[in-house]
UniProtKB/Swiss-Prot annotation:
It comes from Crotalus viridis viridis. InterPro entries: Cyt_b/b6_N, Cytb/b6-like_sf, Di-haem_cyt_TM. PROSITE patterns: CYTB_NTER. The cytochrome bc1 complex contains 3 respiratory subunits (MT-CYB, CYC1 and UQCRFS1), 2 core proteins (UQCRC1 and UQCRC2) and probably 6 low-molecular weight proteins. This is Cytochrome b. Heme b b566 binds at H89. The gene is MT-CYB.
Length: 128
């Protein structure tokens, strides 16, 4: 396959003319969410939700579980990266005027509120 044929093949993809690097953040959201689900699952396996043993189970994950400290750090950093990608994704929508499409914008707003409520509940009530 020649270089010119490869460039022609990529130019025929159905992509708008105003595509930019801002559009990558939607797929990065999926990657961050996948990492959050996987690390959260493995952390939940070793976590004890008892109020008297919660701190001990965190120490157990950090010290005794193989690569537990990596899972904890990946989960914490992944959550921050997830929210950064969300805010950049929303900023792209505002910049390109996607808020004019009311149905899509309202469904995205509903997803954002649900996401923030879930993240808040998981941070506040994980010890009860």
């Amino acid at each position: 396959m020649t270089h010119q044929h490869l460039l022609t093949m990529f130019n025929l993809l159905p992509v708008g003319x105003n595509i930019s690097t801002w559009w990558n953040f939607g797929s990065m959201l999926l990657s961050c969410l996948t990492i959050q689900i996987i690390t959260g699952f493995f952390l939940a396996i070793h976590y004890t939700a008892n109020i008297n043993m919660a701190f001990s189970s965190i120490m157990h994950i950090s010290r005794d579980v193989p690569y537990g400290w990596i899972m904890q750090n990946t989960h914490a950093i992944g959550x921050s990266l997830f929210f950064i990608c969300i805010y950049i994704h929303i900023a792209r929508g505002i910049y390109y005027g996607s808020y004019l499409n009311k149905e899509v914008w309202l469904s995205g707003t509903t997803l954002l509120i649900t996401l923030m409520a879930t993240a808040s509940x998981x941070m506040c009530y994980h010890d009860t």
